[in-house]
Amino acid sequence: MASLSLSLGLLVLCTLALVHLHDLHGGPIRVWDIRAANLKGWLFSKPNPYLKVWCGSSFHGKSNTLKRQENPIWPDEFNFANIINNSVLTLEVWDDIIGLDHHMGTCTTTIHPGTHSETCQLKRGTVYYSYSYQMEQ
């Protein structure tokens, strides 16, 4: 009886280890079609929005700054290689103000395989973006 319990315990442990290893497989992620609606600038000015983009601990960089845009559409596309499933994709929205940039808000989503469209409500506007993620086998 003890031998059977030990065997079942080892089987469960091995199964959990395999499931965990499956989640550690990385793959590429692409972030595109990034746009916003009704962004409100600092005080009464139109914003000069730009993005900072991360996936997990990998910082990809920032987008172009779009001058005086309340409804920006960024032409930028961000590509990351070898990202682990369930990593967090982070987009920060900033207003480029001369001498002092203003953080307008942050969008986060936990990535999953497939192609997804996301909506992120900020205090002063809404951000829309798409991402696709494919885990390597």
Model-derived regions: residue spans:
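Universal eukaryotic N-terminal targeting presequences
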Residues: M1-A2
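Cleavable N-terminal signal peptides of Sec/SRP-targeted secreted and luminal proteins
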Residues: S5-H20
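C2-type phospholipid-binding modules
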Residues: V19-R30, A36-W42, T90, W94-Q137
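Calcium-regulated, polybasic anionic-phospholipid
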Residues: I29-E70
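Short proline/glycine- and polar residue-rich coil/turn motifs
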Residues: L66-P72, I83, I111-G114
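Short strand-edge motifs at loop-to-beta-strand transitions and within beta-strands
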Residues: W74-F78, H116-E118
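Short Pro-Gly-centered beta-turn/loop motif in secreted/extracellular proteins
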Residues: N79-S87
